[in-house]
Amino acid sequence: MDDMMRAMDCLNMAATLRNAALASATCTGRTLGEDREPIWVEGSRKTPEPPLPEESPAPEPNNEIPLLPKIDFEPNISCFPDLQAINASIVRRELEEEGKRCVRQQLKAIRDKQDAMRLSRETQQRKEERQRDQLQQKALRERNESLLIQKADQMTAAQLEAQQREQLALRQQIDQKLHKLALEGVSRCQRRFNQKYEGIAKILLSLNPETVKVCAAQNTQLKELGQKFEQLVSSVKMGNCEMQSQFLCSIIKAEEFCKSLDALELDIIKQLAEFSEQIQQQLKMEAAKKLEDERQRQQQQEEERQKLEEQQKLEEQEKLRKEKEESAAKEKQQEAETAKADAANVPAPLEPKSQDVPPAATATSTSVHPDRLKFYNDILALYQSKVDAVKPLQTEESLKQYRTGCQRAINLPLNAISAVSPQHLAQNFDKLYSFFAGQPTKVMNGTITINDHPLARDYCMLLMAKKFVSQTETAICSNPQAAFPFASVIITFWKLLPDFGKVFLAYMYKESPFLVPYVIPQQQGQTPEQYLKTIGYRLTDKNELEKPDIYLKRQTGLARLYAAVIISQGRKAAGPDECFELNEGWLWLAHMVHVKPLPDISATLIMEILQTLGFELWRTYGKQFVKLLVYIQNIYMPQLAAYDEGGPKTRLEMLLAKFLRERQIAQAVGVLPPGFW
């Protein structure tokens, strides 16, 4: 029974029933509950009725087997059943049915669970079998694929080897054809190259040694091209080309060498043409110089002849004067004797005193001093010779980019000149001077040097001088102190490049001939507009003459720069020699007050020169300069008043009065101290 109960506890119905069958064969009495007397014995004893058994609670939904209620009596078929027994029997049967039903439910649940577990095991087994089959099929498939791949690799390797053999044979055929074509192409280029090379060599051999030196660079380049072409031909003949493209490259290189040789021939011809033109220019310049020397010699002879004639005339006049004096003395002596004899009391008439008559001023003496005129002509002649010399460079269209590079190399550092610091001024000067010294200079399109063209030095000198003069219209007009750093750089270049100073003066004199000083006279038949152009007036965009105030402003800037150049010192490293000293300012003032005054411009320029140079002139010349100021105030100003009654003349009068009253002139603002840079 214990085994049956354990089996019941384990919900193993089959084992429970089997154990119950075994127990029922050996069971002879009651197997559950306490030992009691039979019900009929208890009934005879009239024992009280046992209480009805309590109904057992309904089974829990957790499928537990309900326990049968305890019955105190045991039915017997021999006894007459009573109501209590019947009820107990009914209850027992119901409980039994309920227990059976619960057992059936539990058995069904167990069977369902077992079926589910069996199905799960079968499903898992089928799945495992299917996976094993799949793995076996996959392994088989992989083996088959590996076999196929091996076979395919073997076939592919064989095909590839065959294709490689075919390609190698085909490539060898193509290489042979390309080699043959390259030989033919290079041979054609070689014939062209040799013909051109021999022609250039004949040209160079026909030149004299001096001309060959001009083409030395081209000669070296010709030799290099010949060597490179020979190397290319030998390389093609030997077939030293690993790639097919190299055969084509060899033909292209041969063509490039031929083109380079053509360009070299053109360069040599151009260089020879330029050299020939330069020789012609030199011959022309020498001829012009000879003509100029001859003209000057004739002019000197003419001047000497005129001086000799004037001297002879003066001697004749002196001789006539002496003869007249002697005859007059004799007449006086005779008259005196007659007077003494005839009229002793009559006094002799007084002889009138002769007055000194100044010599008549010629047109030249009222316009310019002869020495200054000669200096002016020499400066312009030098300027014109340089302008004529650089025309080939200036007009050649192929050199436009080079001219632009030269302009950038000059304009950028020149526009940056200022007295911000000595280092800044020296840095911009060094950029300009290094370019003139032949150092490579970076520009927008690369690097250039002044030695790239034989005429570049004169061209750049003219360009820089013109750029310095143009600063009078921009920087110096708006800022008078800016004239002094520009003047210091100009003086330094003047010391290092003497021709630059003369070219600079030529541009200054072209813009303002009054700086000579030269008051150009109006020619007969010349219109007022034409005359104003000759003294520096410009035409506006509307083809009209500029206004007088604009003209005076520009002339003031020119005079300020001119005066600043006179008193400025150059860089210490450039040397102590002065090339445009203070006596130039003294000469200008002395000559300016002896030429014909012009309205506005004469007073404006004198006032600007005095304000800029007055301090240095007073300190250097002292009383002589004071006498010059007094002469300007007392002699020149009345002459100027006959032509000018405008504002510049009034301001000059006030300035002279202030200088003479205070007995000093303040130093110009912005003058660089000695040794500034």
UniProtKB/Swiss-Prot annotation:
Molecular function as annotated in GO: inositol hexakisphosphate binding; phospholipid binding; translation initiation factor binding
Keywords for this protein: Coiled coil, Cytoplasm, mRNA transport, Nuclear pore complex, Nucleus, Protein transport, Translocation, Transport
Positions with biased composition (Basic and acidic residues): 34-48, 294-340
Gene Ontology CC annotation, any one: nuclear pore
Biased composition (Pro residues): 49-60
Family annotation (InterPro entries): GLE1, GLE1-like_sf
Subcellular location, record wording: Cytoplasm; Nucleus, Nuclear pore complex
Pfam families: GLE1
Keyword Cytoplasm: yes
Keyword Coiled coil: yes
Coiled coil: 122-179, 280-346
Function: Required for the export of mRNAs containing poly(A) tails from the nucleus into the cytoplasm. May be involved in the terminal step of the mRNA transport through the nuclear pore complex (NPC).
PANTHER family named in the record: GLE-1-RELATED (PTHR12960), MRNA EXPORT FACTOR GLE1 (PTHR12960:SF0)
Oligomeric and partner information: May associate with the NPC.
Family named by the database record: Belongs to the GLE1 family.
Identification of the protein by name: mRNA export factor Gle1
Native organism: Drosophila melanogaster
